[in-house]
Amino acid sequence: LISKEIGQSVNGRSINHLMLGTGKTKVLLWSQMHGDESTATMALFDLFNFFHADDEHNDLRKLILGSLELHIVPMLNPDGAQQWKRRNDLEIDINRDARMLVTPEGRALMSLAKKIQPVIGFNLHDQSTLYAAGRNDNTATLSFLAPAYDYPKSMNEVRKRATQLILTMNEALQTKVPGKIAKYDDAFDPRCFGDTFQGMGISTILIESGGFYADPEKQYIRKLNFYALLNAFVSIAEKTYVNQNLADYEKISENSRSLYDVLIRNVSISKEGIQFRTNLGIVRSQIKGPDFGSMSYNGRIEELGDVELTHGYDEIEASSLTLTPGNIKLMRKSEWEALSPLQELELIRAGYLFVKWTDGTSPSGPLKARLLNLTNKETNTIQTASIGQQAQFLLSRDGKPVYAVLNGYVLDLTKDVTSVPNVFGY
């Protein structure tokens, strides 16, 4: 493994290029050009560990490293990664800078590509977890694209090779996550590195890490990246990708923004003096900690109404349920501190979602390791469902809470669930 600095970020952080393999076919991989997209970065280090191991897979390593020369930039945007943000410290999206090359990070990548002249490139990203593979409940766990290199979306040998490699990876991944692989729209954008590299003769493949149920940290998706890339390397080494039929690319489902974190169907809501049944979609957004080293979540109502052809990671059929506001429990700070998770759960079952201290002002912002929210208000201002409102309410049957929605997380009150990632202080 050879490591070289190919440039520095806006704030002087090293951008490193690692090389391994002695083969004739050069392959370039780069990750985290968007600083808050790190799933593939982890997978690249899994690959480094794999290639430096000594076990029953030595023949596979010999095949790949003897056939390919791998050039890897695991973190193109270290400033963005440090602050967990998409853009660099000039506030420019590096992946929209392939033409102007204003960013030092973009210049470093372009310079490397021109210097080594790879045959194949892998552009590694994360996408929202709310994309589906088609208009169904299959999450788009990984999405692919063989970018166009011109506005007519022409297909030459360079783009054909990228498409065939996608089909090779899709074939392998369908055995692990059937139905959960999608493809991106291929509208040409000359600002993007993938489109530009394709036009430069580098067969470029975009891989986007999306969502998978009960994998919020994308650790399973990390493994799928590793698996997909390893299969691609073998196919490149053995040139088996040439057997793929281009027509099969059209059979891969389109990427579709049609998921919610929580979808509640047919719930009864009272609003503006009217009682009606409708559907309610909730999404959870990330909140960066002050040190950029921790993450909290903010669950809000994104949709009310007809949600045709949309689905949720968690779904509740609420045709017998009514949305009801949570009550506020008054207690001293010391009493709140002494509450066990099961005691908090019992208060929620009794209809409480908030605690107000009677002897002081409680903190605002995300609260971890608690179930009940804190409030400094005399009354609960969340009395019904509104677009953009934080998702803090009960679903009740005949006046008895059946589910609690706490900051966009669903608690089935028939079960002893005693944790959510975070609630809030108001």
Positions of PLM-derived features:
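Short glycine- and acidic-rich boundary segments immediately preceding or forming the N-terminal edge
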Residues: 1-15
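Conserved beta-strand scaffold positions in the cores of enzyme catalytic domains, especially
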Residues: 3, 17, 72, 121, ...
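Short beta-strand/turn micro-motifs at beta-sheet edges
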Residues: 12, 81, 192-196
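Active-site-proximal beta-strand elements of phosphoester/diester hydrolases
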Residues: 16-17, 28-30, 94-95, 206-208
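Active-site/substrate-binding loop(s) of hydrolase catalytic cores
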Residues: 24-26, 33, 38-170, 179
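C-terminal accessory segments enriched in acidic
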Residues: 145-154, 162-426
